[in-house]
A protein has these predicted regions:
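Short alpha-helical transmembrane segments in multi-pass integral membrane proteins
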Residues: 1-24, 78-143, 187-257, 315-382, ...
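N-terminal transmembrane alpha-helices
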Residues: 8-40, 44-45, 61-73, 77, ...
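Transmembrane helical elements of multi-pass membrane transporters/channels
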Residues: 19-38, 139, 150, 173, ...
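Small-residue-rich hydrophobic transmembrane alpha-helices
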Residues: 50-110, 147-166, 287-353, 386-408
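Short runs within selected transmembrane alpha-helices of multi-pass transporters and secretion channels
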Residues: 71, 140-158, 166-177, 195-210, ...
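Transmembrane alpha-helix boundary and packing residues in multipass membrane permease domains
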Residues: 24, 28, 40, 57, ...
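Hydrophobic transmembrane alpha-helices of multi-pass small-molecule transporters
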Residues: 62-65, 177-181, 207-211, 298-302, ...
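Helix-terminus/linker motif at the lipid-water interface of multi-pass membrane proteins
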Residues: 29, 33-51, 120-127, 183-190, ...
Length: 472
């Protein structure tokens, strides 16, 4: 543990960013690839199945929101406590995290199953897509707890200095999912039900992978993939006595996790509203196009989020240790990496939108293909400055100031985007939905640049005050 802490305190910031980014990015790439391949196989079933999966997508994103509520909050608090050299408190946070996940998973499952049909109809399903969406979700509901224990705990693993474990856990689930998707759709012809079972099994295996590491502290087998050896031992151990809920710990976790939770929840709710508006103006095909957009969007968001995750332990540790110069440098490097990642994504979308549409819907009509290409180019036209909307709010979470992140996230998703989309869709119908996104990205980027400028000045002032105290 001391070695990991020393590197966070002393090593080159850029070197640390790359070290933590690469395994997180590889894990994210596999997850995104799974997402794309999963939609690819669903698209092979039918356009209705693709649209149905698109409706279910935002429900699954609600599950992710709850995983982030506890997981991101726990990861941030663990980073800060380790920076303060409070290892025992960090282990208590881990125990409380497991308990919170178990309670949330059971409650969420019960609430969702009470009236699934109504939820789906309000989410943009229609008579054509409801059977597909319902079949998919009835199976996926069993994956809530495994999803919490796999995806949710990756933030804690990163905070504990074991990002490769988080990477391999995601890879185990995603690769299993991809293989089973192919078998289910192309070999067994089980339709959307088969893809749902593939997702369930993948999440279960990933959860087992993570939980074994946390409980045993190491792995029973040696793993070497592309030069990445999984030889880490856990600096945090799951102990039964730490699983009893502690109000101060839960409060700390939820206060920081509230920002990504609200962001993801707002994104999910806005997505459900968007689906309903798209279905009203564009029917099943409109929802299918929206599903394609939502299949590619994580390529950008997960890449930039990998940057945000990579700097979280660096910023959290150094902020707790009052190394403000290193905090400032890490923030600027993260902003640059986020902009660069988004720029690569933008170039690809602008160059080959036709191929991106046909990948999911090869039977698309000429008119439908034209509409899909137009939608992609408009929707992602200002995606580069949009990367700031991930990096900067996550920075505030990492430094234990969730209130700023909550305000920023709600401003973007609810106040700006939802309002703009409703107005634009009334004026330009389906095109209005596509134009609402870049308009929101532009306005929000201006707001974030102001916040970034103010924060950099604060960090400079804190560093100067610290140096003055040392001189005395």
């Amino acid at each position: 543990m001391d070695k990991k802490h020393n590197e966070l305190n002393d090593d080159s910031i850029f070197k640390l960013c790359i070290k933590y980014f690469i395994p997180t990015f590889i894990g994210s790439v596999v997850v995104v690839l799974y997402n794309i391949v999963d939609r690819f196989f669903v698209g092979k079933i039918s356009e209705k199945a693709l649209a149905g999966a698109g409706v279910a997508f935002y429900i699954v994103m609600i599950f992710i929101a709850f995983a982030m509520l506890v997981g991101v909050g726990s990861g941030a608090v663990v980073s800060i406590r380790l920076g303060q050299k409070k290892g025992e408190e960090a282990e208590k946070i881990l125990g409380n995290t497991i308990t919170r996940f178990a309670i949330l998973g059971i409650v969420l499952y019960i609430l969702m199953m009470i009236n699934l049909d109504t939820i789906l109809l309000y989410s943009g399903a229609n008579a054509e897509t409801l059977p597909y969406a319902k079949t998919y979700l009835e199976i996926i509901m069993y994956a809530i707890l495994p999803l919490f224990f796999s995806y949710g705990l990756t933030n804690v693993l990163n905070a504990a200095g074991t990002p490769r474990v988080a990477m391999f856990s995601m890879m185990v689930g995603a690769i299993t999912n991809i293989i089973l998707d192919y078998v289910a759709v192309m070999v067994l012809h089980t339709g959307i039900e088969g893809t749902a079972y593939a997702t369930l099994i993948g999440n279960i295996l990933s959860a087992i992978f993570v939980m074994y590491f946390i409980i045993a502290g190491k792995f029973p087998i040696k793993i070497n993939l592309f030069g990445y050896k999984l030889e880490e031992t856990s600096s945090l151990k799951l102990k039964l006595k730490n699983m009893k809920l502690s109000y101060p710990i839960v409060k700390d976790i939820l206060s920081i996790g509230m920002s990504p939770f609200l962001l993801q929840m707002a994104s999910s709710v806005v997505g459900l509203v968007t689906n309903k508006i798209v279905e009203t103006n564009g029917g099943t095909y409109g929802v299918a196009v929206m599903t394609i957009i939502n299949s590619y969007l994580p390529v950008m968001t997960m890449t930039v989020y990998s940057v945000a995750q990579a700097i979280q332990p660096i910023i959290g540790f150094n902020y707790g240790a009052e190394n403000y110069r290193r905090v400032k440098k890490a923030l600027l490097i993260a902003v640059a990496m986020g902009l660069f990642s988004a720029a690569i994504f933008w170039i690809v979308v602008m160059l080959i939108p036709r191929e991106l549409i046909l990948f999911f819907n090869e039977k698309s009509t000429v008119e439908g293909l034209y509409e899909g290409i137009k939608a992609l180019r408009i929707y992602f036209s200002l995606v580069i400055p949009a990367s700031l909307g991930i990096i900067i709010p996550n920075y505030y979470q990492s430094t234990g100031r969730p209130r700023y992140a909550v305000i920023l996230n709600l401003l973007r998703q609810v106040v700006i985007f939802l309002l703009v989309m409703v107005i634009f869709s009334r004026i330009w119908k389906l095109d209005g939905v596509w134009y609402a996104q870049p308009f929101t990205d532009l306005l929000f980027a201006i707001v974030l640049l102001i916040f970034l400028y103010v924060e950099l000045r604060k960090l400079k002032r804190k560093e100067e005050e610290k140096l003055k105290k040392l001189d005395k």
